[in-house]
Amino acid sequence: MNANSTTTAIGLTSPFEKLSFFPHSSNLILAHLHEIIFSFVFYQLAFSVVAPFLNKVVFRKHYTTIRDPLLKIDFNVHTVSMIQAVVSNTVLLPTLTTPMHYNVVTYTDSYSSMVSSLSAGYFIWDLTMCVRYFKLYGLEFTGHAIGSVYVMLLSLRPFCQPWIGRFLIYEASTPFVNINWFIMQCNAKSKNSIPLWFNVVNGLLLMTVFFVVRICWGSIASALLFRQMWKVRDELPKFSAVTMMSLNIFMNLLNVLWFKKMIRIAKKLAKPAPTSKLD
């Protein structure tokens, strides 16, 4: 099987392929536009309808008594993020069977394009939330959303499609990040409303998974991708290659920054509470 193998060689096809608005277009963004739109609408409905319902059922008074509208929005956004992490980690699994040595410039298949499109739809939604509530999410999350949208759309050039699932696997740490956030919000209102053991277990899983998939694998994957690009350097679209690697470096640095914050929080929580001396 050569490096330019297409979807027919490995049997990866999008289940939504027949719903395309532009089924005969050679432009992958147009061919998969329906998946981008579907994904955006899906997550908007999840934010507006599903998340509020789930939060009322799961968190009860911790959610229903919130008076700060921004905090309630943040609750809903974190719930949507949980849904997206489950969806993303499920749909990306078949893409991990795509050999890494396939040509990063020419390789594409219908299924990987679908994964990119569904992810692009989510990150476009995420970007709209970051812009709309910039005071809440700030420059870090907005920058992350912009970079993610760009990378997903760039993969529909096509570019680096064999690596889509291998970078989206970062989302494996997202559920633990969100659970940690929910625990902090619940305990802020009612101290120890979440058992300490549950908090500790989730915290350990969060730091372990985050370190493995985002710090370790993130660095290794970036190095391997750079090596793959170097092998086909004469074919590379220069601007796309430079921006892709720049964004990889940016994302890796951002992950290191977030991991350092986790360590600081963990150290703070591990410190025993000060006790007053009895005279």
UniProtKB/Swiss-Prot annotation:
It is a multi-pass membrane protein. InterPro entries: TLC-dom, TLCD. The keyword Transcription does not apply. Keywords: Membrane, Transmembrane, Transmembrane helix. The keyword Transmembrane helix applies. The chain crosses the membrane at residues 33-53, 80-100, 111-131, 136-156, 163-183, 193-213, 239-259. Pfam families: TRAM_LAG1_CLN8. Residues 54-79, 132-135, 184-192, 260-279 are cytoplasmic. It is found in: Membrane. Disruption phenotype: Leads to cell death when overexpressing the camptothecin mimetic TOP1-T(722)A mutant. Residues 1-32, 101-110, 157-162, 214-238 are extracellular. GO terms for cellular component: endoplasmic reticulum; membrane. One of its GO terms (biological process) is lipid homeostasis. Residues 70-271 form the TLC domain. PANTHER family: CT120 PROTEIN (PTHR13439), TOPOISOMERASE I DAMAGE AFFECTED PROTEIN 4 (PTHR13439:SF0). Belongs to the TMEM56 family. This is Topoisomerase I damage affected protein 4. It comes from Saccharomyces cerevisiae (strain ATCC 204508 / S288c) (Baker's yeast).
